[in-house]
């Protein structure tokens, strides 16, 4: 029987079957509840909507994301998302398939146990496993050693991995990711006189960001280019037909990844965080990390980001060091793909936590079997 692989991100949930090369279902990790009282009889109004349906009815709903900064904060809503994944997206009976879930690095232990408990007690899974997201991305790139810069919608991590083991003392977390960049773009578009405020309008700005933003190789240079010519300007049509023009916002938005001070944050940018993470590792393995710096997650999809990372890290590292930034084209889904690879390995089959083991040991079993 095929195992299920579910990668629950802060922004998008990716789900599918182990052994496939891409997720079957990709939908927003959103639960929406009606803002207004239903007046039409027989409309069959629901008290909650999940994913794309919530997205399409966003005009009348309040949208909530149960996963914040990579970590589940609302378990009732999370259960709704899983329910939706099994029954509506994949159309499978969860009690018939082992399920591989992913978790953020440095996920609190209690969260891991809660995930395990819900899978076995609510969904009656026959077996499950919890894997760290960044480790799966590295598997997907065909490596067992390297440092993964995983930046999604809710959180960014740098995770050094040696021979398949994450090095927890050197993992760094940066609470700056796609959602913050969307908020920042909303803010700088407001300076242009365009107003975006509601949760529904935020989704429009997210689309603008995904379609038009890019990372400048040299920010100051790009700013002066933008000031002196209109070559960088692009137009975007809003759902109501209004057309807006966006110029230096295109690269000012993702620049915040390298200069978090743009968002009023006192933290190191992604290049410096990656370097700091490498420096926390044993001196003997640093060379391997510099040469295998793997980008993963949706917020690494900006054009120009790998060249910029190469430039910034070269400036920080010893001058003779060989630095290689690996940016696989499918990196938006590399966590899921890594999970699909892992769950279909024959050697992995003894790693599953079975329902029987869970019944004997309780949720704590997850710390012994998943590392």
Curated annotation (Swiss-Prot):
Database matches in SUPFAM superfamilies: Actin-like ATPase domain
Statement: the UniProt record of this protein carries the keyword Ion transport: no
InterPro entries: Actin (IPR004000), Actin/actin-like_CS (IPR020902), Actin_CS (IPR004001), ATPase_NBD (IPR043129)
One of the Pfam families matching this protein, by short name: Actin
GO cellular component terms listed in the entry, alphabetical order: cytoplasm; cytoskeleton
Keywords for the protein's UniProt record, in alphabetical order: ATP-binding, Cytoplasm, Cytoskeleton, Hydrolase, Nucleotide-binding
Broad EC category: hydrolase
Protein name: Actin-5
Organism annotation: Dibothriocephalus dendriticus (Tapeworm)
Gene: ACT5
């Amino acid at each position: 029987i095929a195992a299920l692989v579910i990668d629950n991100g802060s922004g998008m949930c990716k789900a599918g079957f182990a052994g496939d090369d891409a997720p079957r279902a990709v939908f927003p990790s959103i639960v929406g509840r009606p803002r207004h009282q239903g007046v039409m009889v027989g409309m069959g109004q629901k008290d909650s909507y999940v994913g794309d349906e919530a997205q399409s009815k966003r005009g009348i709903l309040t949208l909530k994301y149960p996963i914040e900064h990579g970590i589940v904060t609302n378990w009732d809503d999370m259960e709704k998302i899983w329910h939706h994944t099994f029954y509506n997206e994949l159309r499978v009976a969860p009690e018939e398939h082992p399920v591989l879930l992913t978790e953020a690095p440095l996920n609190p232990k209690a969260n891991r146990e809660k995930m395990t408990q819900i899978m076995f007690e609510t969904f009656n899974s026959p077996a499950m496993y919890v894997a760290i997201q960044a480790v799966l991305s590295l598997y997907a790139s065909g490596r067992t050693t390297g440092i993964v810069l995983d930046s999604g919608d809710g959180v960014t991590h740098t995770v050094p991995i040696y021979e398949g083991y994450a090095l927890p003392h050197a993992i760094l977390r940066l609470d700056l990711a796609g959602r913050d960049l969307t908020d920042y773009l909303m803010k700088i578009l407001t300076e242009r006189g365009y107003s975006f405020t509601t949760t529904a309008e935020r989704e429009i700005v997210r689309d603008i960001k995904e379609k038009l933003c890019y990372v400048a190789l040299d920010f100051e240079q790009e700013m002066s280019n933008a000031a002196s010519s209109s070559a960088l300007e692009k137009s975007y049509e809003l759902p109501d037909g209004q057309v807006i023009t966006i110029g230096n916002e295109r690269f000012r938005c993702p620049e915040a990844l390298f200069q978090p001070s743009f968002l009023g944050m006192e933290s190191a940018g992604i290049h410096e965080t990656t370097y700091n993470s490498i420096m926390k590792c044993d001196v003997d393995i640093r060379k391997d990390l510099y040469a295998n710096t793997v980008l993963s997650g949706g917020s690494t999809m900006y054009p120009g980001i790998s060249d910029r990372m190469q430039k910034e890290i070269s400036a920080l590292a010893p001058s003779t060091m060989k630095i290689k930034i690996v940016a696989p084209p499918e990196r938006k889904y590399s966590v899921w793909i890594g999970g699909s690879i892992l769950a279909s390995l024959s050697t992995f089959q003894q790693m599953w936590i079975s329902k029987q083991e869970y019944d004997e040991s309780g949720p704590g079993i997850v710390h012994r079997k998943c590392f």
